[in-house]
């Protein structure tokens, strides 16, 4: 039956071949070989750039008059060959950072063939683009060193004036940037340990406690009295022979590389408020003071300071709380032995400044180290016959020791704040604020590694990255606001149209 049905169906004619025509001697159809590469046309460059292009939105919010006034003293207007417009050079660098182009050389090549880039610079299709060496020389030799910081601050002020910042809570964290240095080319050096910001205050409080305990005061050994024979602590450091300013960054258990660290602060909306660049081997808690002081001096209305576990130190908790702000820090796991009494199992006696163990024995305050750590010890005779000795965690001498910091009460207060609903809510915003800033900077703006060498050049490079990110967010937000206000009259008209009574309803009433 199927065979009969197939035989009854007429054979359809063959489809004509559009690629090969036997009648014309096997020549391709001319309509498919149209070539307009050499066709002369008259076109307006303005019409070639899409209306929704990012550079159009940036051009609408950015002003450059202050740049001309700022850079006017660095140009000669009555002698020599005319120089390149400085705003054009700055725009070329902004293009590089806005679109994540790795180098100025590649940026120069992209601008030559990109119509939108030429429009943004104000150049025509046949105009010669400034060479990338001209841009590099201007930023290295001609322009002032603080220009990148001024560009960053100017864009941040624009966001502030447009009420786009929410600095009620700030988020501080650090991310590493791979340096342009071979990790196999290094040398070991003995370098002096940098003095902490709080070392003087800590030493005074420690010496006060040591005097009460009948101990000798700790002398100043941070290098302030080297002229009088004082000693300064040193440490061995791995120094790159290619870029001595970078530091060895331990990335995981097996990976080590030379890198820089960008310690960054942002607000609730992801706008970068401040950045401090250090070598990769500098701890987050060491560089925290510079970032925190800079941001809070400019935005004193900050109420919450959110950080990760790397910033959970007594000094940071103390400074934030004494500034009448609330530190939001995460839970950190206990690093002691699992089968012994934990520090929170001991009860503190405020009157005697001592601890009472779960077995009912007293641990007295014996000394305070120069690091600010108080040591509490139990009596050997008491612990000798204690039934809890197997789980007590006593040392070889039969003494149970407990160590707390001189500013431990601030860390205890941080733990209480962490458990509040407000604290949990704000800490959960880290993934959409500071972590999002780092993700966008590395994935969209090529901040995963740098070709620059030297701390000053890398710092300027990072500030331009963050300035471009703030400018992009500012332009997109302002563009969306303008669209909203354009649509707003039509919205109210529709509301009046549907809510107003019809003529028939008026007659009935």
Residue map of PLM features:
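Phosphate/diphosphate-binding loops
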Residues: 319, 326-361
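Conserved small/polar residues in nucleotide/adenosyl-binding loops
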Residues: 498-503
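Basic, short loop/linker segments at the boundary and entry of helix-turn-helix/winged-helix-like folds
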Residues: 51, 56-94, 99-100
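Cysteine-cluster motifs in flexible loop/terminal segments that predominantly coordinate metals
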Residues: 356, 360-366, 372-402
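Polybasic low-complexity intrinsically disordered regions
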Residues: 112, 122, 130-322, 328-332, ...
């Amino acid at each position: 039956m199927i065979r009969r049905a197939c035989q009854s169906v007429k054979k359809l004619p063959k489809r004509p071949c559009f690629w090969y025509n036997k009648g014309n001697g096997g020549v391709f159809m001319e309509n498919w070989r149209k070539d307009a590469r050499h066709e002369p046309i008259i076109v307006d460059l303005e019409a070639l750039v899409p209306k929704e292009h990012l550079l159009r939105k940036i051009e609408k919010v950015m002003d450059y008059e202050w740049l001309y006034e700022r850079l006017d003293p660095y140009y000669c207007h009555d002698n020599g060959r005319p120089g390149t417009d400085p705003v054009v050079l700055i725009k070329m660098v902004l293009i590089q950072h806005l679109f994540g182009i790795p180098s100025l050389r590649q940026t120069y090549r992209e601008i030559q063939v990109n119509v939108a880039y030429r429009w943004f610079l104000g150049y025509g299709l046949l105009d010669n683009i400034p060479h990338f060496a001209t841009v590099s020389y201007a930023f290295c030799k001609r322009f002032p060193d603080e220009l990148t910081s001024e560009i960053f601050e100017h864009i941040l002020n624009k966001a502030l004036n447009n009420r786009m910042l929410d600095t009620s809570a700030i988020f501080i964290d650090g991310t590493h940037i791979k340096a342009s240095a071979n990790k196999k080319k290094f040398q070991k050096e003995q370098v002096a340990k940098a003095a902490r910001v709080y070392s003087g205050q800590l030493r005074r409080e420690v010496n006060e406690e040591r005097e009460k305990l009948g101990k000798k005061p700790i002398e100043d050994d941070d290098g302030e009295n080297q002229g009088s024979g004082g000693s300064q602590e040193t440490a061995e450091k791995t120094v790159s022979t290619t870029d001595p300013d970078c530091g060895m960054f331990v990335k995981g258990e097996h990976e080590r590389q030379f890198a820089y660290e960008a310690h960054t602060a942002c607000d609730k909306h992801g706008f970068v408020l401040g950045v401090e660049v250090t070598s990769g081997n500098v701890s987050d808690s060491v560089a925290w003071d510079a970032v925190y002081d800079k941001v809070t001096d400019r935005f004193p209305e900050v109420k919450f300071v959110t950080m990760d576990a790397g910033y959970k130190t007594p000094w940071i908790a103390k400074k934030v709380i004494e500034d009448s702000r609330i530190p939001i820090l995460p839970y950190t796991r206990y690093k002691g032995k699992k089968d012994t009494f934990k520090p929170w199992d001991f009860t503190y006696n405020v009157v005697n400044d001592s601890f009472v163990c779960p077995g009912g024995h007293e641990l007295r305050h014996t000394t305070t180290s120069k690091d600010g750590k108080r040591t509490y010890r139990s009596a050997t005779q008491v612990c000798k016959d204690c039934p809890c000795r197997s789980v007590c965690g006593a040392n070889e001498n039969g003494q149970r020791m407990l160590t707390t910091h001189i500013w431990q009460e601030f860390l205890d207060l941080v733990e209480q704040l962490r458990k509040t609903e407000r604290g949990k809510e704000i800490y959960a915003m880290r993934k959409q604020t500071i972590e999002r800033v780092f993700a966008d900077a590395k994935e969209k703006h090529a901040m995963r590694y740098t070709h620059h060498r030297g701390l000053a050049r890398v710092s300027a490079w990072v500030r331009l990255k963050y300035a471009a990110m703030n400018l992009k967010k500012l332009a997109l937000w302002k563009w969306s606001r303008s669209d909203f206000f354009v649509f707003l009259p039509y919205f109210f008209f529709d509301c009046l149209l549907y809510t107003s009574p019809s003529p028939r309803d008026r007659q009935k009433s």
